[in-house]
C-alpha cells in the first residue's frame, strides 16, 4: 500500500505532540539523520534576509522661505493648532511617527510643495 504525501501529512496532523516527537525520533534512528537545523549553516550566510521597513518617521528639517505655507501644510498633516504648528515649523522636528510608506511619502510631498525640507526615516 502506497500513501500519498497528503495522506501522510493528514495522518501526522491527527497525532498528539508526544506522538509526533516519537515519530521524529524513530525517523532519526531509522535514517541516521538529525531533525535539528545545522547551526553553522544558518549563521554562515551573509545574505541574511533584510526585513523591509514598514513604519516610517517623517521629520521636518527646514521650513524654507515660505513659512506661512509650511505652517498651513503642517496643520493639515498633523491636526495641530496654529501656535503648535508654528512652533514645530520654526524648530523643526517629528511630524509623524509610525506612518506607512504611502502616508509618509504623501506628507513629504505636501510639505515639499509648500517649500519645506522633509526627511523620511
From Swiss-Prot:
Organism of provenance: Xanthomonas euvesicatoria pv. vesicatoria (strain 85-10)
UniProt superkingdom: Bacteria
Keywords: Ribonucleoprotein, Ribosomal protein
GO molecular function: mRNA binding; structural constituent of ribosome
Any one annotated GO CC term: cytosolic large ribosomal subunit
Protein name (record): Large ribosomal subunit protein bL12
A Pfam family this chain is assigned to: Ribosomal_L12_N
Xref: PANTHER family: 39S RIBOSOMAL PROTEIN L12, LARGE RIBOSOMAL SUBUNIT PROTEIN BL12M
Function: Forms part of the ribosomal stalk which helps the ribosome interact with GTP-bound translation factors. Is thus essential for accurate translation.
UniProt record similarity statement: Belongs to the bacterial ribosomal protein bL12 family.
Subunit comment: Homodimer. Part of the ribosomal stalk of the 50S ribosomal subunit. Forms a multimeric L10(L12)X complex, where L10 forms an elongated spine to which 2 to 4 L12 dimers bind in a sequential fashion. Binds GTP-bound translation factors.
Alphabetized InterPro entries for the sequence: Ribosomal_bL12, Ribosomal_bL12_C, Ribosomal_bL12_C/ClpS-like, Ribosomal_bL12_oligo, Ribosomal_bL12_oligo_N_sf
GO biological process, one term: translation
NCBIfam families assigned: L12
